[in-house]
Amino acid sequence: MSSLDKTMHFDFNQNKGKNVYDTLQDVYNALEEKGYSPINQIVGYLLSGDPAYIPRHNDARNLILKHERDEIIEELVKSYLGKNK
């Protein structure tokens, strides 16, 4: 049986945590480099949905926009509660 005949399984959630984590790290670093308070800016973005809270520096705005806000909040809550599984 060739590989084209087999049903492939794709688990979208498998890499979400790492991607969100890496994105938040990059955004945090970009905000810090620009002299902003990273926590305040990220919280402002998450609450309002306004990407203007995130600078274009180091492509931070485009990076964070690749994730839905609810997805980011979900990962933050999981991390905070130690439920990263």
From Swiss-Prot:
One Pfam family here: IreB
InterPro entries in the record: IreB
Family stated for the protein in its record: Belongs to the UPF0297 family.
PANTHER family per record: UPF0297 PROTEIN YRZL
HAMAP family: UPF0297
Listed name of the protein: UPF0297 protein LGAS_0422
